[in-house]
């Protein structure tokens, strides 16, 4: 018989820096899960990644107070800001430009994000990345 799922917890946690302080502690504590067990497992799983990189994680909480988790690829905005060399996007997208990214960089980002995107082809994924770049106020150049 399968375990009873009592909920899903979606968080964005910096790679290798999971600790019991908010937002992780309260989110897991409400479901009665072992906070330190998650922190140790997550930090071990993200050890090889760039420290501080935001990693989306979906934690599945079960009725017997156990859990499983799935890590995803970092947000598209993280990759775009890194490629453009900026700290944050434009406050007025469409009017002011925050920076530029090349189509080669966009294609690179699309290939990294492909497992998490619901697009059938790389071309469709590239269009998603271009749309995100424009909404951040970044110009996409050839």
Swiss-Prot record:
* SMART domains, per database record: RL11 (SM00649)
Please provide, alphabetically and separated by semicolons, the GO molecular function terms listed in this UniProt record.
large ribosomal subunit rRNA binding; structural constituent of ribosome
Q: Is the keyword Electron transport in the record? A: no
Q: How is it modified after translation?
A: One or more lysine residues are methylated.
- Describe the protein's quaternary organization and the partners it interacts with: Part of the ribosomal stalk of the 50S ribosomal subunit. Interacts with L10 and the large rRNA to form the base of the stalk. L10 forms an elongated spine to which L12 dimers bind in a sequential fashion forming a multimeric L10(L12)X complex.
Query: What does this gene product do?
Result: Forms part of the ribosomal stalk which helps the ribosome interact with GTP-bound translation factors.
- Write down what this protein is called: Large ribosomal subunit protein uL11
Its source organism is Rhodospirillum rubrum (strain ATCC 11170 / ATH 1.1.1 / DSM 467 / LMG 4362 / NCIMB 8255 / S1)
Taxonomy of origin reads: Bacteria, Pseudomonadati, Pseudomonadota, Alphaproteobacteria, Rhodospirillales
Q: Which gene encodes it?
A: rplK
